[in-house]
Amino acid sequence: MDTYNSDYGRLNHPDDIAKYASLRSFKDFLADKSSPLVYCTLTIEGKSFLEKSHFNLQFHQKTNEHDTFTLDTRADSLDNEEAYIMEHSKSYLGKTIHIHLHRFGEIKQTFTGIITHLNLLKKDGYGRLYITGHAPTIMLEQGLESQSFENKTLEEIFQDITAQYPKDTLHTIVRNNNTQNVLPYTVQYNQTDYQFLQQLAIRYGEYLYYNGQSLVLGNKVGPKIINLDESVDLVHVSFEISVKPQQFTYTTYDVESGTSLQRDSASAQLQNKVNPYQLVALKASKNVFHKKPNKLHNPTGINNRTDRELQDAVRKQKELRENLMIVKGKSKDPQLKQGDLTKLVDINDRPMETYRIIEIQHFHDGNSYYNEFVAIPDLWTPPYFDDNTYPNCEEQTARVVDNNDPMSMGRVRVQFPWQERKNQKTPWIRLIQPHSGAGKGFHFIPEIGEEVLVGFESGNAEKPFVLGTHYNGSETSGYHTSGNDVKAIHTRSGTKIILNDAQGSVFIEDPSGNTWTMDGHGNINVNASKNFTVNAGENISMTAGMNITTSAGMNITESAGMNHSTTAGAMMIQNAIGDFSLLAKNIKKIAHENIQTSSNDITKQALKDITVSSQTNINKHAKDEVFVNSGKNTKNH
């Protein structure tokens, strides 16, 4: 019998089994600790995704931006092309996906994202499915929000914002912040939560990035420094250095002390620079740029932390200017991610210094992998730092919630409508007055509950001030006239000053009913519900063109420390319903012509002598008799 020829289809021959059993599965390659090849696997809800399909992968990570990823694969990888469009693939929209990069038998990096977009492209009967998505930070883009934070650190604000989101999807890390001090007043105004965090990172010089698993705020770096050797994984690298002006002065104004503050770049103490290329660029910059310009720094400036803010701003600005180097490279190491430190070594094993990854793109086509990265020297302040970034805000109304300024500066605290839900309010803010100065000025402070119009210095939502007060539909003055005739000051207690242009009058009233009226026709009427007192340190003069009338319901008392003179141009009449008494040490009556005394009875009495004298005659007349009596003698001459 002829031997069976295996070339023509023998089955299960031991030689064949031994030969083909040696072929390894994909899982075997993933577990191979000696393989430098990079493999990519995907999982959704704990299950493998596109396990048996070819796909291309790209994901992009950049500091202070949303990370993104794109997968493209054949449309029939998920959908039956004879079925409805995206019949199965559409169910993956909004799902959380895990992208794993394997090398040397282990997962070197996992990127977790959310599928946010599906695109099915059909052409010539074939389809291509593009699956794109974002890091979980995209959840922070749920709509515009307005709120404020008072006396909180940057870390506390960050935790307050992210606490509203599921921790199993959006994990956060805060570590080694560049800004440690308490922030007096921080505003999120018509911004998404992510836009707000981005702005804080830019303004306060903080690294904000997603490392594939967590949203990181601060100067955190990876658990180890990743070496990239030019002879192993570093494909190519470029180094760029430049010069920038290094000298500057910041000037600001402190509201509470009423003084200007200055700090220059020489006052800032920074970390030691160990990168020799950076040191060269720094020295060259100082040789090129000599002028020290003076710039206005516009801090929050609403409390006594202004100098601390200025000090921090100068330090961060100086470090920003000393960032004179950027490195761009391409590598095959899949463990690189943003926020990591990488140490570069050239082909001759010479170190090319250590750098922080601030941007990286990963590419995998199913067969090969590489990444392209951007890095800078390891500095505390990121390259996008800008201390002149702030939330823009337009003028708007608010309600006064406190006016008892602890520093007696005439400030108030107000609450905007968007602060009411969380019972937030501004710190003490100033208000515009017609005139002000030390111990003088115009002191009109709005009452608690009153509506005011608030402006913002330079449009900065964190620098509000009161422009003035105004009425609304439910709170009117009560002084409206069709001719706009009335100008009035009316205080909380009921004190009024009313100027009436129609009448030409001025009316002043207090809560007790005391009034002062100038009627516009030459008349003044003063009314006191109780007492009226006039005091003068020297003289009081009263003049009337015609008559002066004084009336009292009971008594009128006049007193003079020395002389009391009353003069009448014609007649002087004094009437008393009861008795009339004149009391004085001496009384002298002088008439240029006649003195007439008329009464029922007239009695003259002296303790000593009575003398009657005349230059001519003395006549005594009586209708009846004249009696002259004396206790002793009577003499007539």
Predicted regions and their residues:
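Amphipathic alpha-helical and helix-coil boundary elements used as assembly
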Residues: 1-637
